[in-house]
From Swiss-Prot:
Role of this protein: Catalyzes the conversion of 4-hydroxy-tetrahydrodipicolinate (HTPA) to tetrahydrodipicolinate.
GO biological process: diaminopimelate biosynthetic process; lysine biosynthetic process via diaminopimelate
Main location: cytoplasm
Catalytic activity field: (S)-2,3,4,5-tetrahydrodipicolinate + NAD(+) + H2O = (2S,4S)-4-hydroxy-2,3,4,5-tetrahydrodipicolinate + NADH + H(+); (S)-2,3,4,5-tetrahydrodipicolinate + NADP(+) + H2O = (2S,4S)-4-hydroxy-2,3,4,5-tetrahydrodipicolinate + NADPH + H(+)
Protein name as it appears in the record: 4-hydroxy-tetrahydrodipicolinate reductase
Binding site for NAD(+): 15-20, 114-116
Xref: HAMAP family: DapB
Gene name, Swiss-Prot/TrEMBL: dapB
Originating organism: Prochlorococcus marinus subsp. pastoris (strain CCMP1986 / NIES-2087 / MED4)
EC number: 1.17.1.8
Keyword rRNA processing belongs to the record: no
Molecular function GO terms recorded: 4-hydroxy-tetrahydrodipicolinate reductase; NAD binding; NADP binding; oxidoreductase activity, acting on CH or CH2 groups, NAD or NADP as acceptor
Similarity comment: Belongs to the DapB family.
Length: 282
């Protein structure tokens, strides 16, 4: 563990050897106002190895640890009297993200969560826990500024369209469907309350689920998983005589890093849970 000697935000990265985690490590190492203090990953064969050497990144003395709990405890003690509090960035797995986030809050460390798959009940539990602990916690389904703008546009347009379909496409290593980003988009559309996609005919499906998953509001969501994709979302709205399509493509994980760094810098100003990058940038 490294003790922060400057006025920088101490950052722990959980899932540090993964695709997103390694990008976060690189961005933190190259940031002037953040400092990497712990790199946690479940890959046991790399335990104790230097993170910079493993990922061929800017020099750092941080060693990979398999022990999230131990890292949280140690960093919490190291910075208990510091004005700038540590932040845990989590890009792990839907099966572990809830416990990881809860543990960080328990140790007084603000979580910035990019892992999707949290249920509404889990998010509500974390919100209550964060508020009681007086700790900022950010649940961010998508760190792309472009995606946030898509969601804002879709939310505004929903007032004018009764028929809306959402398509989300990701690489075939993504575990959860639909994506947290797409769920967030649907929730923002549903802020204008009405029943969407009311059928004018009696529909039948010769292949079950071919029309996609249907939310209580009537919004249809279609999930695609293919090699060669990264992260893509399309919102298609239709009315007589026209369609309106909003599309966002992420072609490199670097697109997420400005949003991640913004969340790291700002979450310390909050004392409760926030959901969505728009809460930080607008």
């Amino acid at each position: 563990m490294i003790k922060n000697s400057k006025k920088t935000t101490p950052v722990l990265v959980s899932g540090a050897l993964g695709r997103m985690g390694s990008e976060v490590v690189n961005s933190v190492l190259n940031s002037s106002d953040c400092e990497l203090v712990a790199a946690i990953d479940t890959n046991k064969k790399n335990n104790g190895e230097n993170i910079s050497q493993l990922l061929n990144l800017k020099k750092s003395d941080v060693l990979v640890s398999n022990d999230l709990e131990g890292s949280l405890c140690s960093i919490s003690q190291d910075y208990r009297n510091e004005k700038i509090k540590p932040v845990l960035v989590d890009f792990t797995h839907p099966d572990s993200v809830y416990e990881n986030t809860r543990s960080a809050i328990a140790y007084g460390i603000s979580p910035v969560v990019g892992t999707t798959g949290l249920t509404p009940s889990q998010i509500n539990d974390l919100a209550i826990f964060a508020q009681k602990a007086n700790i900022g916690c950010a649940i961010i389904p998508n760190f792309s500024v472009g995606m946030v703008l898509l969601q804002q546009a879709a939310s505004v347009a929903a007032k004018f369209y009764d028929n809306i379909e959402l398509i989300e496409m990701h690489h075939n290593q993504k575990a959860d469907s639909p994506s947290g980003t797409c769920i967030k988009t649907a929730e923002m559309i549903e802020e204008y309350p009405k029943k969407y996609n009311q059928s004018l005919v009696e529909e039948s499906e010769s292949l079950k689920g071919v029309r996609g998953g249907v939310r209580d509001s009537g919004l249809n969501i279609h999930s695609i998983r293919l090699p060669g994709l990264l992260a893509h979302q399309v919102v298609i709205m239709g009315s007589p005589g026209e369609t309106y399509t909003i599309k966002h493509d992420t072609i490199d994980r670097k697109a997420y890093m400005p949003g991640v760094l913004q969340a790291i810098r700002k979450i310390g100003k909050f004392n409760s849970l926030i959901y969505g990058l728009e809460k930080l940038i607008f």
